């Protein structure tokens, strides 16, 4: 999953293959890793700029040490540009979809998840549970494949008088705790800061995943509890983080994770509110 998979050890290794169309771009990226396995991503449409694709530098066996150092520096610089452009395209793709909570069109979903996979292949932190300081803090959800549709949306009042605000994840590494906060705005009750709060604990499960255990949940203020009382189980069933959570991409300001049900979560780091 790390970036060196894109750097073939010799000229005999496969080079990335890219096909482009104007407008939406169909990207086919395939490469052969050092262990002989062929990895590929295809059938995903992206709106990518030409400079998005990283150049794979070939190193000749007769290159001088200085030339090899220059090649390595160029590769590192190109990789940073590539990740930067993936993130830029991802943020652009996420505009106007309200985090995907109420569903997105299939072509848009394919575009977003294709960009997420490209990011995961460039993960600068392949063993995030060994660098917990990078995980701690406050994160805001900007995309998820979890959806609230149909009767669920109606029962929770999300069609009429209840609006979803930010979905936050506050991670306390020292305590081994995570607090998930779902903000609400209820029209007519003048509640600008109502929230549904889920407290959970976590423990390291592997080099890239944690096991999350639900502990408690509350709704504030009391007026909101009166609204959601009959549908608390439904609300908790949608947003309960319990289970295995794999951190598949992590840098200073962006996190991608996948839960045990296959749902994708993209979060950006923010200052604690």
From Swiss-Prot:
It comes from the Eukaryota. Disruption phenotype: Seedling lethality. Severe reduced growth, strong reduction of levels of plastoquinone-9 (PQ-9), and loss of plastochromanol-8 (PC-8) in leaves when grown on MS medium supplemented with sucrose. Severe decrease of photosynthetic performance and higher levels of reactive oxygen species (ROS) under cold stress. InterPro entries: PAP (IPR039633), PAP/fibrillin_dom (IPR006843). It holds the Pfam family PAP_fibrillin. Keywords: Chloroplast, Plastid, Stress response, Transit peptide. Residues 57-66 have a biased composition (Polar residues). GO terms for cellular component: chloroplast; chloroplast stroma. Residues 69-80 have a biased composition (Acidic residues). Expressed in developing roots, developing leaves, young stems and sepals. This is Fibrillin-5, chloroplastic. The keyword rRNA-binding does not apply. Disulfide bonds: none annotated. The gene is FBN5. One of its GO terms (biological process) is plastoquinone biosynthetic process. Residues 1-61 form a transit peptide. Residues 57-81 are annotated as: Disordered. Belongs to the PAP/fibrillin family.
